[in-house]
Amino acid sequence: MIMSTCAANCIPLLIQQSVDGTYSFNRSWAEFKVGFNDSRGNYWLGNDLLHQLTNGARYKLQCVLQRTSRVFYVANYNIFLVGSESSNYTLSVGRYRGGAVGPGDAMAIHDGMMFSTYDRDNDLSSGNCAQQHGGGFWHNNCYSAGMTVMKDQGDGFVWKTLSYGTLQRATLLLTC
């Protein structure tokens, strides 16, 4: 197990990045377990490592959402914890904190959800959200924060509390 302490001056750690919605996050349980990336910057850290990091320290989650080259939204959560594989990497997120132009709380419905992929369906939907929308995530029924959804699978990156349109880029960061 990786034990870590969170210093006040820690550097944010990239958990996930979807550069433009054309990269497929429709990956297997085994791939999400260890993580993956490509040369353009699309990235998933890996669920095992997320569990190891967050199990030993108190971390926060920062979601950076880019609508256009000049329009960004930031959503912060005061707790981010990922359970072990035996719990299906159950997600715990704390209270939402947004800025003056915050995007709103789209992660709340994902709190307490198990991770789902096309080959391991743990969501609350009668279907398979990861398979339907083209990406593994802590789906509920199905998502409010569609951080791994491909543009050709419907909405593209979505943060449902934003009033209109899709996002160009979505990034999740582990912060202190």
Annotate each PLM feature:
Residues 1-176:
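Mature extracellular or lumenal effector domains of secreted proteins
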